[in-house]
Amino acid sequence: MTLPTPPVGTIAVWSDIGCPWATLALHRLYGARARLGLDDRVVVDHGLFLLEDVNEAPTRRSTHDAEIPVIGTRAPELELTLWHADVSTWPVSTALANEAVHAAKSQSLSAAEQLDMALRLAFFRDSRCISLLHEVITVAETCSRVDVAALSAALDDGSARGSMMRSYRMHAGEVQGSPHFVLPDGYEVHNPGMSLRWLGRAGGFPVIDEDDPSVYDDLVRRAAA
């Protein structure tokens, strides 16, 4: 089984909303797309790589708090922060938030893009518990491209969950990690332009050895070609 190749003008991105590395990667991708004047020619098609299922555990807050200071320095404009809400409200699951993005895809890939980034920032910047339905809907209400009533109905009846999970189960073995990009020409790359490692065991922290944001310009151009 191989990952599906998207059509020209589309970049498939396999990730989890709870992954800050994917959040940085998508931010850089959107920035490159805008800078190159290709907002109307290149779109992201979100695929799920559900980390809580892969790891059979929720993402620990300690991992989050180790990653955010490192990632935040690479894109200070995102205003990512350590978790600053009550510890009891830490979102132990991102399955519902990811489901919301896949439900929004039935409206448009553009709507899914907007909701995905809004939910990421609600988590990583605003410390909101995106495991909760009302929080997901409240975030969706800030997204101009999303039909919130249709999204709410889709989440109530679970219409997107089945197809999302089938796709995840079918392709998880081919995804190298979050984020994993697939281009229309078949090129694939995990966490573009970046090489990192972890120092220490429990309580360790990530070290970025290489980081080249310019690779996103090439990815966008290739997708549009």
Q: Model regions: which residues?
A:
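Basic/polar N-terminal segments that are highly enriched at the extreme N-terminus
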Residues: 1-6, 225
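A generic fold-level signal
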Residues: 6, 95, 175-176
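Extreme N-terminal starter segment of soluble prokaryotic enzymes
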Residues: 6-12
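An acidic- and aromatic-residue-enriched active-site/binding cleft used to recognize and process polar
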Residues: 16, 49-51, 186
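Structural alpha/beta surface segment adjacent to cysteine/selenocysteine redox centers
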Residues: 24-127, 132-133, 202, 222
